[in-house]
């Protein structure tokens, strides 16, 4: 049994409200769960922000016993400071070859094998370099 930490949808039509749940990966989205770990309201409140409440000690427990967060929950846990940022991959042009080098989410730069950051636009030759080579 693989335990996943995921969102379960509640609320009316066009007014979603989510609970953060620890549930078996085979159970349906809104089905049987093991524990409620928090809530997330994506609609802006009176202050204009989204509301989120999490039980950090229980989330840390479930992560320590091997529970896997879903992608939306991983982004929520990153925003709350509980997990490191999820890995991002730079995408090339539409229809062209994809660049699969990892990207640092804080700076938006490529990360080399030696953990050095390289500017994302440095992989393209500059106009001055191409003119010097042709001359």
Curated annotation (Swiss-Prot):
GO molecular function, one term: structural constituent of ribosome
Tissue expression as described in the entry: Expressed at low levels in flowers, and, to a lower extent, in leaves, stems and roots.
One GO-annotated biological process of the protein: translation
Record keyword Ribosomal protein present: yes
Composition-biased stretches (Basic and acidic residues): 124-135
Keyword Ribosomal protein found: yes
GO cellular component terms, A-Z: chloroplast; mitochondrion; plastid; ribonucleoprotein complex; ribosome
Transit pept. (range): 1-7
Annotated region (Disordered), positions in chain: 87-135
Keywords: Chloroplast, Mitochondrion, Plastid, Ribonucleoprotein, Ribosomal protein, Transit peptide
Main location: mitochondrion
Protein's cellular compartments: Mitochondrion; Plastid, Chloroplast
Database matches in NCBIfam families: S16
HAMAP family assigned: Ribosomal_bS16
Protein family per UniProt: Belongs to the bacterial ribosomal protein bS16 family.
Further facts: This is the only bS16 protein that is targeted to mitochondria.
Quaternary structure and partners: Component of the mitochondrial ribosome small subunit.
UniProt name for this protein: Small ribosomal subunit protein bS16m/bS16c
């Amino acid at each position: 049994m693989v335990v996943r930490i995921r969102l379960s949808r509640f609320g009316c039509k066009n007014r979603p409200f989510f609970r953060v749940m620890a549930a078996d990966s085979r159970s349906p989205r809104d089905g049987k769960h093991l524990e409620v770990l928090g809530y997330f309201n994506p609609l802006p409140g009176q202050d204009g922000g989204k509301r989120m409440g999490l039980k950090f000690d229980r989330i840390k427990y479930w992560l320590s016993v091997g529970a896997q967060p879903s992608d939306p929950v991983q982004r929520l846990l990153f925003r709350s400071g509980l997990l490191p940022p999820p890995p991002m991959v730079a995408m090339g042009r539409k229809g062209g070859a994809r660049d699969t080098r990892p990207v640092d989410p804080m700076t938006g730069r490529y990360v080399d094998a030696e953990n050095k950051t390289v500017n994302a636009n440095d992989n393209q030759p500059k106009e001055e370099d191409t003119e010097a080579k042709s001359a």
